[in-house]
Amino acid sequence: MTMITPSSKLTLTKGNKSWSSTRCGAFLLLHLVLQPWQRAGAQATPQVFDLLPSSSQRLNPAALQPVLTDPTLHELYVISTFKLQSKSSATIFGLYSSSDNSKYFEFTVMGRLNKAILRYLKDDGKIHLVVFNNLQLADGRRHRILLRLSNLQRGAGSVELYLDCVQVDSVNNLPRAFSGLTQNPQAIELRTFQRKPQDFLEELKLVVRGSLFQVASLQDCFLQQSEPLAATGTGDFNRQFLGQMTQLNQLLGEVKDLLRQQVKETSFLRNTIAECQACGPLSFQSPTPNTLVPIAPPAPPTRPTRRCDSSPCFRGVRCTDTRDGFQCGPCPDGYTGNGITCSDVDECKYHPCYPGVRCTNLAPGFRCDACPVGFTGPMVQGVGINFAKTNKQVCTDVDECRNGACVLNSICINTLGSYRCGPCKPGYTGDQTRGCRTERSCRNPEQNPCSVHAQCIEERQGDVTCVCGVGWAGRAGYVCGKDVDIDSYPDEELPCSARNCKKDNCKYVPNSGQEDADRDGIGDACDEDADGDGILNEQDNCVLTHNVDQRNTDKDIFGDACDNCRGVLNNDQKDTDGDGKGDACDDDMDGDGIKNILDNCPRVPNRDQQDRDGDGVGDACDSCPDVSNPNQSDVDNDLVGDSCDTNQDSDGDGHQDSTDNCPTVINSAQLDTDKDGIGDECDDDDDNDGMPDLFPPGPDNCRLVPNPAQEDSNNDGVGDICEADFDQDKVIDRIDVCPENAEITLTDFRAYQTVVLDPEGDAQIDPNWVVLNQGMEIVQTMNSDPGLAVGYTAFNGVDFEGTFHVNTQTDDDYAGFIFGYQDSSSFYVVMWKQTEQTYWQATPFRAVAEPGIQLKAVKSKTGPGEHLRNSLWHTGDTSDQVRLLWKDSRNVGWKDKVSYRWFLQHRPQVGYIRVRFYEGSELVADSGVTIDTTMRGGRLGVFCFSQENIIWSNLKYRCNDTIPEDFQEFQIQTFDRLDN
């Protein structure tokens, strides 16, 4: 463990010049600056423990134990410098038990939630959590943090957090720490975060004693001195001191920049030398000098009587009789000798083969094997020294880069006999596993693939998608045409083949499903005779089914041709199991094989008929499955029966504590991936694969999918098993509306709950809801009492958008949408009135509606009834009922038969709300950042009050817990106003 003190010397060199000689004035300045403080009274010198030792050192955590358990220790500092990828999470450092992995002390960054968490062991053996909110620590930038812990040995301690030299948070009255630290030095283990690509941990130090000013200076931070000094000096001295400190800070910054540059240059040179092919030893052999063919020794004297007929010569050698006997010719090719005796020549000694290729000597001749892998050329075979010298084997390097060895659009480096694949070429992104595709970026105009009329969106893992802007429609944001009614279909056909390139069959009426019953090219939404039977829709008893005779046996409002119960009056046409037979005449409404009269859940399939509480209502549809409530009363419409509804909700997320899977953590969605009864928001291992989500030995690279081996072939920090589908719901992340929630994949309001907000009296009728386009469009046809159509899906953070259109000219009342719905007394509503009007029933109070858009928080003590009805109508606050959070200052009402697009952002964890309205492509209303925490999440839906023929088209929702950037700006402005 390295001990560092502020008095340690530092000498740098630049070229042949000592940096200390050129910058000696800086140390003189430091000496002059510190003199007044030394005169004012010496402070204890800080002890600094470097927790990032070099690889040659081995950290001994036991050395920290006497420091942390020192009863005289009043202050403790932890300083760190690091960089984390955007939205990532990591445990920066921590002390753990090496025997059972329990925590003693730990600091974790949760980038997705913009939080940091400090955990430490209390006296009672439990872990205490200190949460720092709204911190931008995981954004791909280098950050410096300083933790100041005071009086943690005594109790009633405090923690201060400094980020990049600025105090951002403090927490007081903390319980005692470190007293429970084990006395066995071998049982303590120090861990730092596991590095990912593009992450680094540059500095991690523990500092004891010393002042905050002294410790901050270790990070080149010069904070205002908090301790009173014995001799502070005059105001002129303070100004002079601050000026000197500023100069010193700049000087130290130059030193650090110089060091970083030198390190980069050294690393570059080292890597260049290591990879240089020409710098290593050559791999070929020098040719052997030519050798002379030995001269055959003189033939021995021939016996006078020996002739060629005795075959005295070597086989194949020509023999000639002479006067003195015989004469042999030269040895055959591949041999050497005197003609009588011939020996095989080893041609391989003359290196006829390509270097590295095996040469085989034959009798006679030689043979070269095939060229090595990565080379091409002929196999050489021949006889004789001359042939071996003049017919050398030639092997030519194969250029694999021309043969597609690497993926398209990547760098390919051809080497002698081989090749090497590099990264993608400039302008492309990817790797050798996934391929290299054209680099697309929303931040660089040259790499932005989107239409000029489209919005560019950067998705998970850097993917880019395009979405046509408001008032435009087309193919995935690449080709966009004008869209007057904002239903995602262009007014005129576009030059592309996608479905959304076709011409809108109702140009001025939004119909995102493009329904056309008679296939005449005119959509049902704007066709006066939608079924083409010659009878106008207003008189037709089957609007979408051709029936000239208009026969109607049961005399309800639906003709026999389209009536799902021809002999039974059923104006609601409800068909629970979708079998074409209406519930009114279907003896098995839910299609589970059990007749209605015997079925304990007639409208919910449940073959097992389980009924734990024995109240005659099956568990599948029982609002209190463990408490008998045969009447199923649910006054507040929260899907929890009155008999078991406690209305005790500690975290305010809409789920009472007795059923909440995270009672003290906001999680309205109640997502529990591993079904262990603990919600993901408070579960350390969401997928139960043994790899913790965040803490060591994690983080889990597939948090929602079991993968204990953590395979990650491209080292991008995301496991192979969840690379393109993070929640493994069979819908790829690019089109998944909730990529981290397998229970939500697409926008769908086909299943909804109707809530009547004025159930008493007969002033008006209840709303009539019609759902189209597979749950992405809702129509309300009646002039009705206030009412809601609420989806069953609950959300934490959410983005909700849709097109709003009043398709009539005969009324002027309220229409809008809701979010954060928890029960019929608790929800947010955005509502729009066309004209000013006093409600016609003055009981219980006179209610006046003003024109314009209003954002209201409903928290009614009475619930549905005349009080809530008049409070919703009235523009303004009403006691114990409704609060007006924002109103459009233009006081402009909606226009008849005009389409508007709304965008809502709700982040219940911080209370962030913002809603915007567009008319065509023009922004006409913006609430700005509005903060309210009345409802901490909930369900979505639509709202109407005394207004008929409302269309909510092209509805879209998306899970989103990311805090928008303007929230930080809003906080800064708010703090500035408070300071002033």
Curated annotation (Swiss-Prot):
Disulfide bonds join 308-319, 313-328, 331-342, 348-359, 353-368, 371-395, 401-412, 406-421, 424-436, 442-456, 450-466, 468-480, 496-501, 506-526, 542-562, 565-585, 601-621, 624-644, 662-682, 702-722, 738-959. CDD domains: EGF_CA, TSP-4cc. It is found in: Endoplasmic reticulum; Sarcoplasmic reticulum; Secreted; Secreted, Extracellular space. One of its GO terms (biological process) is nervous system development. Its main location: endoplasmic reticulum. It holds the Pfam family EGF. Glycans are attached at residues 631, 960. Residues 1-42 form the signal peptide. TSP type-3 repeats lie at residues 482-514, 515-550, 551-573, 574-609, 610-632, 633-670, 671-710, 711-746. Keywords: Calcium, Cell adhesion, Disulfide bond, EGF-like domain, Endoplasmic reticulum, Extracellular matrix, Glycoprotein, Growth factor, Mitogen, Repeat, Sarcoplasmic reticulum, Secreted, Signal, Tissue remodeling, Unfolded protein response. Residues 605-615 have a biased composition (Basic and acidic residues). Residues 679-690 have a biased composition (Acidic residues). InterPro entries: ConA-like_dom_sf, EGF-like_Ca-bd_dom, EGF-like_dom, EGF_Ca-bd_CS, Thrombospondin_3-like_rpt, Thrombospondin_3_rpt, Thrombospondin_C, TSP/COMP_coiled-coil. Residues 596-691 are annotated as: Disordered. It comes from the Eukaryota. Mainly expressed in astrocytes, and in ressponse to peripheral nerve injury, significantly up-regulated in the dorsal spinal cord (at protein level). One of its GO terms (cellular component) is endoplasmic reticulum. Homopentamer; disulfide-linked. Interacts with PTBP3. Interacts (via EGF-like 3; calcium-binding domain) with ATF6 and facilitates its processing, activation and nuclear translocation. Interacts with NOTCH1. Belongs to the thrombospondin family. Adhesive glycoprotein that mediates cell-to-cell and cell-to-matrix interactions and is involved in various processes including cellular proliferation, migration, adhesion and attachment, inflammatory response to CNS injury, regulation of vascular inflammation and adaptive responses of the heart to pressure overload and in myocardial function and remodeling. Binds to structural extracellular matrix (ECM) proteins and modulates the ECM in response to tissue damage, contributing to cardioprotective and adaptive ECM remodeling. PANTHER family: THROMBOSPONDIN (PTHR10199), THROMBOSPONDIN-4 (PTHR10199:SF92). This is Thrombospondin-4. It comes from Rattus norvegicus (Rat). The gene is Thbs4.
